[in-house]
Amino acid sequence: MIQPIYIFLLVALVVSVTIAMLVLPNILLISHKKKLFDMPDKRKVHHAPVPRLGGLSFFPVMLITMGGLVLIYHLMGLSSGSMHGEVPYEFLALLVGSMMLFLVGLADDLIGVGYKKKFLVQIVAASLLVASGVWIKSLDGLFGIYQLSPWVGMPFTVLIVVYVTNAINLIDGIDGLASGLCAISLVALAGLHIWLHLFSFALLCITALGVIIPFWFYNVFGNAMRGRKFFMGDSGSLSLGYIISFLMIHLSTVDVSPHVVSDYNMVFAFTTMLVPLLDVVRVVGHRLRNRQNPFLPDKSHIHHKLLRCGLRVRQVMVAICLLSLMFILLNFLMIGHVNITYILGIDIAVWIVFHLVLDVILHTRRAEMDI
C-alpha cells in the first residue's frame, strides 16, 4: 500500500503546477499592460520585447503551496513519522533569505539594481542560512580534507550559496535553459531526499518543481509576437538559485543513519548543478583573462558557444540539459567506487574535452567561412 506521505507529495506537485498555471497568465497580462519588457540588444538572443516577470510567480506560489499543504497535513494528523519533529529554524532562515532575494530580483527586473547591491543582499541571505545551522562542516575527503572548523566552514558556505545562486542567474540566457537545469536538479534532489526520508525537504523540491514546469512551457513554446512568452527574470533566478543552494548544502551535511549515503552526499548534491557551476568558473576566467569586468554580461557562456557552432536555441537548450543528465549519471555510477577528488577531476576533464571539441568545431566553421 502506498504511504500517505507519497500521495501527499504527489498532491503537492499537482497543486503547485495548478496554482502556477492560474497565476502566470495574470502576470503576463499585467506585464503587457504596463509594458514591463526585456528589450532585445546585441548581447541577447531574442529579437522581440518579452516580459521578464515570469519568476514573480515562483516564491509566492511555493510559499502558498508548501505552507498551505503542511498546515492541512498536520491538521489531518498525518505528521507522525514523516515531517514531524524536523527543526524549523533552517526553514525560517530560508523563508527570510528567499524573500530578500525575491524582492531584490524583482527590483532589478523593474528598475535595475547594481551588481554590488545584489551581492550584498546575497551575502546577508547566505549568512542567515549559516546562522540557522546550515553550513558545510566537512568536505568528505575532497583533496584529503574532512572536518572544517566553523571559522572556515561558515564563510565557505556563504561563498558557496552566492556561487550557486549566481551560477543559475548567469546561465539564464536562452529559452528553457535555467528552468530546465533547475528542474533536473530538483527531480534528483527530491528523489534523494525521499530516499533519505527527509520529506519536508522533498516537499520543498517538489513545490519548486511544480512552479517551474508551467513556466518552462511558456518560456520555451510561448510566442513572443502573440504575447504568450515569459522570461524568468532575476526575481525567479535569484530566489530559485538560493533555494537550490540551500537544498544542496543541507544534503551535503545531513546524517540520517541508517539511510545515510556515506561520504558521497556532497558529490550527488553538487552534481545536480554541475554544468552552471563549471560554466561560471570558465566564464569568469575568460573575462579576467581578457581584462574584462567579471560581473558584467558578455557572450562567452556555454550556450553562446553552442549557438556559434550552428545549433538553434532549442537544440542548445536540449544539448546542455542532456549534458547535465550525463554528469549526474556518470557521477552516480562512480559513487562508492571512485575517490571524491578523482570524481571532481574526471568531471573537470570531461568539461575541458567538451569545450576543446567545441573549439575545433568553431575553428572549422570560421575556416569554411573564410574560404
Q: Where would I find each of the regions flagged by the language model?
A:
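A generic, lipid-embedded transmembrane alpha helix
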Residues: 51-71, 127-131
